[in-house]
Regions:
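Bacterial N-terminal signal peptides that target proteins for export
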Residues: 1-8
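Cleavable N-terminal signal peptides
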Residues: 8-10, 20
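C-terminal capping alpha-helices of c-type cytochrome domains
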Residues: 12, 75, 84-109
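N-terminal signal peptide c-region/cleavage motif recognized by signal peptidases
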Residues: 14-17
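Residue-level hotspots at or immediately adjacent to binding/recognition sites across diverse folds
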Residues: 21-23, 42, 83, 98-100
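Sequence/structural segment immediately N-terminal to covalent heme-attachment motifs in c-type
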Residues: 23-43, 56-58, 107
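Gly/Gly-Pro-rich "capping" loops immediately C-terminal to redox-active cysteine motifs
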Residues: 29, 45-72, 81-85
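C-type cytochrome heme c attachment motif
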Residues: 33-41, 54, 65-68, 93-97
Length: 109
């Protein structure tokens, strides 16, 4: 009986955790479409100019650091500084994770 209760509890916790992850992914995808897609493409793979970087497959910690630097002004680009400024730390983290999970630049071993 105790094993059944533990199994049911774990199933409930994992189910809610997966739902939260799916919600975070959906929110990040929507934010990426609203804020990033016009220049970087919807999946971060088709930048509109050669000077615009591909975001797909970049490391999430790099993307997060870059966005935080644009937000603080430590990294300068008029467009990116303005776009990063209103983003919350959570949105930045979610965007970084979203683009890092898209197929792209990084070779996975």
């Amino acid at each position: 009986m105790n094993k059944l209760i533990i199994a049911a509890g774990l199933t409930w916790v994992l189910g809610h955790a997966l739902t939260a992850l799916a919600d975070d992914f959906a929110a990040a995808k929507q934010k990426a479409e609203q804020v990033c897609a016009a220049c970087h493409g919807p999946e971060g793979t088709k930048p509109v100019t050669p000077d615009t970087p591909k975001l797909a497959g970049q490391y999430d910690d790099y993307l997060e650091h870059a966005l935080l630097d644009y937000q603080s002004g430590a990294r300068q680009n008029a467009l990116m500084n303005g776009l990063a400024k209103p983003l919350s730390k959570q949105e930045i983290k979610e965007l970084a994770q979203y683009f890092s999970q898209r197929p792209g630049l990084r070779t996975r071993y």
